[in-house]
Structure formats: structure tokens, C-alpha cells
Amino acid sequence: PVKNVKPLWSRFGLFLGIFLGALDMWFANILGFNLFGTVKHKCADHDTLKRASDCKVIDYPKSDGKISFERLDNVSFSGTAHSDGQPCHLSLDDESIPVNHNLPAYEEPAQRYCPAGVYEIVREGDNLNPRFQINYQNCVHCKTCDIKDPSQNITWKTPQGGEGPNYSHM
């Protein structure tokens, strides 16, 4: 029932978009159909990403362990489990793109948009040769990487054995 709210909001602005979205939700819940059918977004999500040079750096406060937590602490709450030796279910079409294209243009956004910290840029020794690392064991299967990657270079596949998060304790 809420599938059209964000596309309507994006197209018509805050007030008209939310009004039309509420009307559409009302029709979907009461009458069983969406007033506007399925409204598509204007463009793909990965096309909306701004270059790092166009954005200011956000300095987030340190987590306190009571109200805010580190990303990997939150991953542990999901009950994520992948067997050792399991093949990686996240693949890159071109392994050079994260470091050669996404890092200079976007400061490699995968390390920020992934809620589980699966992707990271590792800098060793002289700090001159960055390396893109995939920590697939942390993956909570949200598929954000498949949707948001600006180069559409990351492919998410279902892991073998259906392993992954177990959200029963969240």
C-alpha cells in the first residue's frame, strides 16, 4: 500500500507528494487497489549519487554503546551466519572500478551505504596502494549494494545454503 509514496513525493514535492501518497494508500487499504497504479521513480537510485567533491564531510560522533552502536555491533544483532569456506555471494564485474573510478569520484560509496560494513578500502604500509575488500560474512542481505553502486559493478546473489541473517532477535 505504500509503494507509491516516495515516487510521488519525489515528483510533486513534500506537501502535494505526501497528500497524493496518503490518498493512494487510503485507496489501497480500503478499496484494494492503488489509485495511480504503480508510479515509477524518475531515475535509478544509483544515478542520484553526488560526487564526493560536491558534498561536505560529515563528522559523526562516536557511538556510546547505549543509544548508538558501531556498525559491526548492529550486524551481530542480526544473527548473521555464513559457513567458513562458503563462496562469496557478492561479485564485481570489474575489480578495478572500486579503486580506479569510485574511489576518486565518490570516495568509494559502498563503504558508507552498506549498513553492515561489508565493503572497505584497505590501505597498507605506504598508504599509496588502496585495495577494495569485501567482507561478505557481515552481509545482512539488504541488496543496497546491487541498487546503489554508481557503476552498477556489484552483483548480489543468493548465498549457498540460504545462509545469512536471522532477524528473530531484532
Segments (PLM) and residue ranges:
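Helix-rich C-terminal "cap"/substrate-channel and partner-interaction subdomain
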Residues: 1-98
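Iron-sulfur cluster-binding cysteine motifs and their immediate structural context
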Residues: 105-136, 143-168
